[in-house]
Structure formats: structure tokens, C-alpha cells
């Protein structure tokens, strides 16, 4: 969910929880408003605010029983509250993102319990040879790191370098879409939270050239990762199944086909075109050829 006033965040949570249909939501990611204004991307600046646990705890309660995941800019978790640690102890999880934090601040956030980096490299402090920033720490630590593999947010060579860097830590490379409501729609002019943008050939930008989000879907992200990194399907699939499930703390019941786990299965053709979807053992979608 994007940065918004608290009442709108509540409405979005309630809508998500009531509109699952055939889909199954593992949790809700509150990407704003606890981010850095300088690294806000297309989040509305006037709604950005400091993280206070009293407010965050109410959001966690509203999201329950789903898992609550928050993006936090850790340089703003220095008000004596220890918000990151409190979120983790309350059963939520934290990703580091939309941040200008230096490496030491990121290191402290990870020690406090942050588990991941939100859309790594995008809207975060850059890697430099004497100050690795959040981008460098995403590669140098065992935390999970999310990547938007659409060829727009990140160059293919950047994706390949990041994938190889994360290999030594196991399955910590997480494929995400960061898709916005215009994903899957024709090219044209759209609006998101009052921000006008144009979608053209898969790229969604404001008139100033700021990327609003992606038009990516997971099958395309998997195919792109295979191409960018020259890896087989079975390895790319781990980045869209096992890794995100482990990041969300639900790999004991989701993220792989195994005895005792949920019977959630997507059946695809050779180009990952979705043919059938099974949720909890029930067929909820079958393509009509």
C-alpha cells in the first residue's frame, strides 16, 4: 500500500481482507508513510510522517490475522522508540526502503530485526566505494532483498550482479512486481493517488520522468530473470516462491509443493502462460483455450 492518511490505509486494509475471492493473501505490505521524503519516489510528500509505534500497532491489529510487513526508512527510527524492534516483537516484519540511510544505520536496523530491503536499488542510498549505503548493504548481508526485474527499474546487468552477490546467502533474492493499478492495461494516461502518469510500453512515469511503479507480472519477472542471469527455470522459480515465503515467515506452509503444505498450485505452459490455478486444493481458474 502506498503512502496515505491513516483512514485511507484502514480502508485499503479492509478492502484487501474482504476482496480475496479466489486469491489468497499471505499478508499486507504497508510501504508508506514511514519513509524518507528525499527518497519518496512517487509517494505523496504531505502524507509522509515519522514512525510511531502507537499508530503502527493499530495498523498491525487492523491487518490481523494476516501478516503485517512495513517498509521503514531506518534513519527515522532514531527517536528513542525503537520502532523496528517493536514491530518485530509484535509479530510484524520490516523491510528497509525509501531510505537515504548510511551503512551503519542499516546495520543497526538489521540488528533490530529488519529482514529485507524493499525494491533494492530503487529509492535508496546508492552504493559508493567508501560508503555502501542501503544498496550495498542489501548485497553484503544475509537479509532478503527484493528486485523489480522489468528491465526498466534495473538494468539487466545490475540484476545479474545482484543475483550472483546474493547466491552465497542462499535463497535471499526475492522477485517482486511493484505493480500499480494500470498493470495489464493499454498504454495511456492514468492517475494514482492524485498523481497523473503515462504508461507507455511497460514504463509508467510522471511528466517529470519519475517512475511511478511497474506494469510487471510475476511470470514475466521470472522469464526476465532467466534471461538476465542465464539461469534455468527451476532456479528462477525459487526467487518467486521459496524466497518470498521465507521472507514472510510462512515457508512452513507455503512456497513449495510438499506434504502438509497448502495445495496452492499454478499450472503454466512453456512460456509461463497461466493455464490453471488451484488454491487450497480447489480449482479457482482454468483458461478457456
Regions found by a protein language model. Give the residues of each.
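Active-site core of metal-dependent hydrolases
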Residues: 61-185
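C-terminal regulatory/interaction regions
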Residues: 253, 262-276, 280-288
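His/Asp/Glu-enriched, well-ordered alpha-helical/loop segment
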Residues: 136-147, 164-177, 182-267
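Conserved, mostly hydrophobic/aromatic
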Residues: 30, 87, 117, 225, ...
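Divalent-metal coordination cores built from histidine and acidic residues
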Residues: 1-66
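Short, electropositive alpha-helical surface patch
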Residues: 8-22, 81-93, 232-237, 253
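Active-site gating loops and adjacent loop-to-helix segments of metal-dependent hydrolytic enzymes
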Residues: 37-64, 108-120, 131-144, 186-216
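Generic structural signal for well-ordered alpha-helices
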Residues: 10-17, 56-57, 84, 106, ...
Amino acid at each position: 500500500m502506498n503512502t496515505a492518511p491513516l483512514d485511507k490505509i484502514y480502508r485499503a486494509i479492509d478492502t484487501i481482507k474482504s476482496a480475496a475471492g479466489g486469491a489468497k493473501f499471505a499478508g499486507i505490505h504497508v510501504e508508506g508513510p514511514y519513509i524518507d521524503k528525499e527518497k519518496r519516489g512517487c509517494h505523496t510528500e504531505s502524507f509522509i510522517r515519522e514512525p510511531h509505534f502507537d499508530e503502527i500497532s493499530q495498523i498491525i491489529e487492523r491487518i490481523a490475522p494476516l501478516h503485517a510487513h512495513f517498509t521503514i526508512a531506518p534513519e527515522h527510527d532514531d527517536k528513542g522508540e525503537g520502532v523496528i524492534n517493536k514491530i518485530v516483537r509484535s509479530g510484524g516484519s520490516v523491510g528497509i526502503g525509501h531510505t537515504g540511510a548510511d551503512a551503519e544505520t542499516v546495520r543497526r536496523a538489521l540488528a533490530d530485526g529488519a529482514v529485507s530491503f524493499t525494491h533494492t536499488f530503487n529509492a535508496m542510498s546508492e552504493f559508493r566505494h567508501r560508503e555502501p549505503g542501503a544498496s550495498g548493504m542489501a548485497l553484503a548481508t544475509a537479509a532478503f532483498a527484493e528486485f523489480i526485474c522489468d528491465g526498466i527499474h534495473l538494468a539487466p546487468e545490475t540484476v545479474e550482479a545482484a543475483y550472483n552477490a546474493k547466491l552465497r546467502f542462499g535463497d535471499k533474492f526475492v522477485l517482486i512486481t511493484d505493480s500499480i493499478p494500470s498493470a495489464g492495461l493499454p498504454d495511456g494516461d492514468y492517475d494514482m493517488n492524485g498523481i497523473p502518469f503515462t504508461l507507455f510500453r511497460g514504463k509508467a512515469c510522471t511528466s517529470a520522468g519519475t517512475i511511478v511503479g511497474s506494469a510487471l507480472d510475476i511470470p514475466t519477472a521470472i522469464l526476465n530473470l532467466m534471461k538476465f542471469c542465464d539461469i534455468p527455470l527451476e532456479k528462477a522459480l525459487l526467487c518467486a516462491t521459496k524466497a518470498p515465503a521465507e521472507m514472510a515467515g510462512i515457508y512452513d506452509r507455503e512456497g513449495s509443493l510438499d506434504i502438509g503444505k497448502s495445495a496452492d498450485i499454478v499450472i503454466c505452459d512453456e512460456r509461463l502462460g497461466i493455464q490453471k490455478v488451484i488454491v487450497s486444493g480447489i480449482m479457482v481458474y482454468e483458461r478457456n483455450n
